[in-house]
Amino acid sequence: MKTVNLAYKDTVALERSGNVITMHTNEELLARYKAQHEAVELQSKPFYDVLKRISDVVCSAAAIAVFSPLLLGVAAAIMINDFGSPIYSQIRIGKDGKEFRIYKFRSMYTDADERKAALMAENESQGANFKITNDPRITKVGAVLRRTSIDELPQLINILKGDMSIIGPRPFIPVEQKELPDDRLLVKPGLSCYWQIGGGNTLSKSEQIDLDRRYIKERSLWTDIKIIGKTVLHVFSGKNC
């Protein structure tokens, strides 16, 4: 079994149970989860891995070419909205615990990171990430981008570079990944995954982890195709993944 070792600073996580919020350290959360779940073993699938990489390169390059007018138009709209950079980048944790810089269209005001600490008490996500309804940091253009998932399109560059895959567990920032088991890092992170099409941020942290582990166990070209199809349906139905 392949293992991944991470060494990040300790943080504190909040767990909701009804109206009760309990504070746990990362070590407590990890210890409790690992005690209830066996680590996932990564099965060797060399043929699948080669085909997956080829399809990632071909599909991401084709998508960038096809959507280039849209990408340029979105970039211009963001700059006109508040004169800031259209691209937002952030360090995320990828395969084998390696850091990489993820790209997105900027959907928030330029001081969004500085304002996040003041909003932590309003976090509605049951998973590892941060989400609140009517986030005041989101711009008018950004609201449209998020509703249509267009803000994620620059990650096609990450896929082309090899940092990510089209399908795989979503990558988190170091402090968030610290709260999660390392075995979800056995494969490349993806643009979409099981839990994004099966409940998204409404799922609990353990449910998201279970679905990531399910993908690692079931990964195949057919599984990837099914997730891609359901992701497209979610986007066109107005459900933000």
Question: Predicted segment positions?
Answer:
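A hydrophobic, helix-centered structural microdomain
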Residues: 43-113, 183, 221, 226-241
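A short, structured surface patch at a secondary-structure boundary
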Residues: 128-188, 227-235
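Short, glycine-rich, amphipathic interfacial segments at transmembrane boundaries or analogous
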Residues: 24-28, 88-136, 192-211
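Short glycine/proline-rich turn/loop motifs
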Residues: 35-45, 120-125, 135-138
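N-terminal hydrophobic signal-anchor/signal peptide
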Residues: 1-65, 217, 239-241
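Hydrophobic alpha-helical segments characteristic of transmembrane helices
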Residues: 22, 32-33, 153-159, 197-198, ...
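Cytosol-/stroma-facing membrane-proximal "stalk/adaptor" domains immediately downstream
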Residues: 178-184, 188-241
